[in-house]
Regions:
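A broad, low-specificity signal for short, low-complexity segments enriched in glycine/proline
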Residues: 3-4, 13-17, 113-115, 125-128, ...
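A surface-exposed, glycine/aromatic-enriched loop/edge motif typical of exported proteins
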Residues: 54-123, 172-207, 259-262
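Face-selective signature of the C-terminal outer-membrane beta-barrel domain
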Residues: 146-262
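Sequence-level detector for tyrosine residue identity
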Residues: 34, 40-41, 46, 70, ...
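Short, functional N-terminal and low-complexity linear motifs
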Residues: 5-12, 23, 117-121, 133-135, ...
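Detector for Asparagine
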Residues: 5, 11, 43, 49-52, ...
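Outer-membrane beta-barrel proteins
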Residues: 23-49, 68-69, 121-156, 217-231
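Transmembrane beta-barrel wall of Gram-negative outer-membrane proteins
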Residues: 1-25, 29-69, 77-109, 154
Length: 262
């Protein structure tokens, strides 16, 4: 992580702070649960005069990480732990170990071809682009990718001795999604997907559909979730005296949301 702070500038009116960090991990817990993320924060504060201050803030974290499947049985990880939690013997499933991930599979034959992989670029966002794979010897069909920054301009004002106002103009949103499977994906004897067999079947048993040509029987798909919100929030507080105050509020926003698969 790197952080830069200017301190007070321009006769103690302006201060700027910026921070950025990078995090990567090949495996967090279960097989295929890697993490690849950036994060950033920027803040600029300017005192217009004794009664008015402006503040600009931007923060976000474009990230990509592999996931485990959400609906695994505890006995698939550990029979001992399952028994401690009250699972009956007849309900125990096959035990695969604590790093079990049914949606991640080690490839017997390295896959070196190009793939459509979600990647983020400034001013272009998340899109599936043809590129080298993250790994040529393992596939995890469950991946999550997001970048949903927050940008806001704040105005703090003392209107008079008894009235203050705080107003924020903001944007919140961005793009992201997750990957999964569509069609038929084969299973192996070890309780995980068999992507070697699925790739071989796609190559030998592609199905023809009118208007679409030959299609693979099992594929990886992406589910997108894009959203953007623009708004203004303002709070006016008035001191009425004798320990009594009145607060007025304004909240106006507009949002756009997209959900689709690709």
């Amino acid at each position: 992580a790197v952080t830069v702070n200017t301190g007070l500038l321009m006769d103690d009116k302006l201060a700027i702070m910026a921070s950025a960090s990078r995090r990567t991990a090949d495996k967090l817990f279960a097989k295929g649960t890697y993490s690849d993320a950036w994060s950033y924060y920027f803040n600029a504060s300017y005192s217009v005069n004794n009664d008015n201050r402006l503040e600009f803030i931007a923060l976000g974290s474009p990230q990509f990480h592999g996931q485990n499947f959400w609906n695994n049985r505890i006995s698939n990880y550990s029979h001992e732990l399952a028994r401690e939690m009250g699972v009956a013997e007849e309900d125990l499933r096959t035990e695969y170990g604590l790093d079990y991930n049914p949606r991640a599979d080690d490839l017997q034959t390295p896959y070196t071809g190009k793939r459509a992989v979600a990647s983020w670029r400034p001013f272009d966002g998340w899109n599936y682009r043809t590129r080298d794979q993250r790994s040529t010897v393992m596939i995890n069909e469950r991946n999550n990718y997001f970048h949903k920054p927050i940008v806001q301009m704040n105005w703090y004002s003392n209107l008079n001795d008894s009235m203050t106002m705080a107003t924020s103009f903001y944007y919140s949103g961005g793009e992201g999604g997750g990957s999964g499977s569509a069609g038929s994906i084969l299973w192996g004897d070890n309780g995980t997907r068999d992507y070697d067999a699925t790739i071989a079947r796609n190559m030998s048993e592609a199905q023809f559909k009118d208007g679409y040509g030959y299609q693979s029987r099992g594929v990886l798909r992406g589910s997108r979730n894009n959203q953007s919100t623009f708004g203004i929030m303002s709070k006016l507080e008035q001191d009425m005296g004798n320990g009594l105050s009145v607060t007025y509020g304004l909240d106006i926003r507009t949002a756009k949301v997209e959900h689709y698969r690709q």
